[in-house]
Structures are given as C-alpha cells and as structure tokens.
C-alpha cells in the first residue's frame, strides 16, 4: 500500500490547499489591517508571477529532464499552478479596484501603458482559468491547446506591466530572463523533435 508520504505527495487536494494558503493569509492580513495597500499589491503580484512562472517552467523542465519522475509528477499539476496564478492576479486586481473605488478613475488610469498591460493580461487569464478543468479539455478537444497557448501573450503582458509600474524594474527583468531561458530550452527541444521526426527518428527528446 502507498505510504502516507506518497499519498500526500500525490494529493491534488493538498496541492490546492498549499497554493491557496498564501492567498488566504494575504486576504486575511489586508482585511484585518496587518498589511497596507502597497504591501498587498506587491505581494499578490509577486505570487501571481511566481505561480505563472512555475506553470510555464514545467514543459522546459520536462524537456531538460524527460526521464525524471519529478517532471512527470509536475505535468498533470501544471493547471493547478495556472489557476493559482489567476487567483493571485484576481486578488491583485481586486485590491486595486477596491482602493480606487471610482469607476471613471479606474477607466482613466487603465489607459496608461503600465495598467493597460496588466488589464489585458488579466483578461487573457480569465478564459484560461475557466477552462482549466477536465470537462473543458474534453469539450474543446484540440481547440483547448490552441486556446491555452495564449498564456504566452499573457506572460509577456504581465512582465510588461511589472516593468512599467515598478519603482525599480530590476527584479522584473531578472524573472523575465530566467523564464526566457527556460522557454528557449523548450523551443530548442521542440525544434529537435521536429527534425527527428522528419528524418524518421524518435519524436521524444533524448
């Protein structure tokens, strides 16, 4: 029988709870006055980016380590990371909207490049989060993968939002560089698979 540790490792419910725990703490701390607006905006934004980066890093890591059990473990859990990214982005946006409290002001500020990129990224995340379930995968078929490829556009917009609104964008550039490096690995692996298939070789990375 599987050990308790193995059951915990494979529990999707536990993973969801771990991803939700910081969200719950951030919301509680803000509502009870333990954190201020600026701290809340930064923290929720950071968590959104971290979860997004983790979700996008799964495929490159699988390309780098195709036979490792931990990358196989990550693959079916990628959607949880994506939904968590949306949940933190939702918290990030909600805090901003509630703070402004005035729709005309929100709309006016939303036209600035720094905020417009954030709103566009958030708009892309909505359909991705709503279709991150097995039922949507079955109903949409091949269209599901095509839809979810727009996450890369959301990632670009997210980092643009971060760079344009940060007092010091150095951290944003560092995160973007790490993600770009991982994605370049995925693209190289994809190109190699294409050449391998064209020459009759294995379509899987070695």
Predicted regions located by residue number:
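Membrane-embedded alpha-helical bundles that constitute the cytochrome b-like, heme-associated redox core
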Residues: 1-206
């Amino acid at each position: 029988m599987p050990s308790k540790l193995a059951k915990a490792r494979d529990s999707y419910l536990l993973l969801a709870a771990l991803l939700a725990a910081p969200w719950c703490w951030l919301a509680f701390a803000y509502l009870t006055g333990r954190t201020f607006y600026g701290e809340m905006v930064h923290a929720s934004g950071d968590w959104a980016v971290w979860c997004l980066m983790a979700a996008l890093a799964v495929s490159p890591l699988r390309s780098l380590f195709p036979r490792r059990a931990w990358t196989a473990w990550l693959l079916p859990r990628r959607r949880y990371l994506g939904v968590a990214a949306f949940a933190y982005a939702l918290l990030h946006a909600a805090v901003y909207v509630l703070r402004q409290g005035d729709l005309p002001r929100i709309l006016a500020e939303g036209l600035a490049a720094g905020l417009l990129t954030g709103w566009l990224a958030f708009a892309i995340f909505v359909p991705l989060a709503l279709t991150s379930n097995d039922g949507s995968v079955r109903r949409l078929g091949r269209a599901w993968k095509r839809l979810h490829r727009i996450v890369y556009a959301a990632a670009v917009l997210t980092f643009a939002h971060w760079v344009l609104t940060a007092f010091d964008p150095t951290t944003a550039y560092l995160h973007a560089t790490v993600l770009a490096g991982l994605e370049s690995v995925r693209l190289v692996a994809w190109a190699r698979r294409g050449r391998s298939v064209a020459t009759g070789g294995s379509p899987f990375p070695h």
